[in-house]
Regions:
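Conserved GNAT acetyl-CoA-binding A-motif
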Residues: 104-116
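Conserved N-terminal entry element of GNAT/NAT acetyltransferase domains
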Residues: 1-14, 149, 153-154
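Active-site acidic-Proline motif in GNAT/NAT acetyltransferases
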Residues: 85-91, 115-116
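Short hydrophobic/aromatic beta-strand or adjacent loop that forms the aromatic wall/cage
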Residues: 55, 142-147
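Acetyl-CoA-dependent GNAT
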Residues: 10-87, 98-100, 104, 137
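Conserved active-site alpha-helix within GNAT-family acetyltransferase domains
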Residues: 95-96, 116-133, 139-142
Length: 154
């Protein structure tokens, strides 16, 4: 069976419900002991107040469904969220979203990833990111790595 075809496009307000549900679903799979259904209202508020106003958001779409998205603030280099549906993970969607993030913010990208998320860390390293610091997530208190990508010097 071939990988589903997908396309990248700019976020539209009509994508909000699908993006937030995808965000919830992927985090629920990553952290099954936490009930993320109780956080949907908080995610929606954060989406509307913190991400949409400042970030460039690109959506991956397959069969008219949102299967991924990335949020990038090109003024601060911040890649806040990259979310990919489990059914298309490993099919190039995340790499395409990272490539798009690099296009949006060509001077560099920074992100934070939980230190126990080894799969994501390996993926980011494969995409050219390096661990550039560490901290505690100010919301959850979990330890995080700061990972950074900068373009090669010309």
């Amino acid at each position: 069976m071939s990988a589903p075809a997908f396309k990248l496009r700019p976020y539209a307000p009509a994508d909000e419900d699908a993006a937030i549900e995808l965000w919830r679903r992927t985090w629920q799979l990553a952290y099954p002991r936490i009930d993320f259904s109780t956080r949907v209202d908080w995610w929606r508020q954060r989406w509307r107040e913190e991400l949409v106003p400042v970030a460039t958001i690109m959506v991956a779409e397959a069969d008219d469904m949102v299967v991924g998205f990335v949020t990038v603030d090109p003024t601060s280099f911040d890649l806040d969220q990259i979310v990919v549906a489990p059914e298309v993970q490993g099919k190039g969607v995340a790499s395409a979203l990272i490539a798009e993030a690099k296009r949006i913010s060509p001077r560099g990208l920074d992100l934070h990833v939980n230190t126990d998320n080894e799969r994501a860390i390996r993926f980011y390293e494969k995409e050219g990111f390096v661990i550039s610091g560490g901290a505690l997530n100010w919301r959850s208190g979990a330890p995080v790595h700061k990972m950074s990508w900068r373009p090669p010097a010309s």
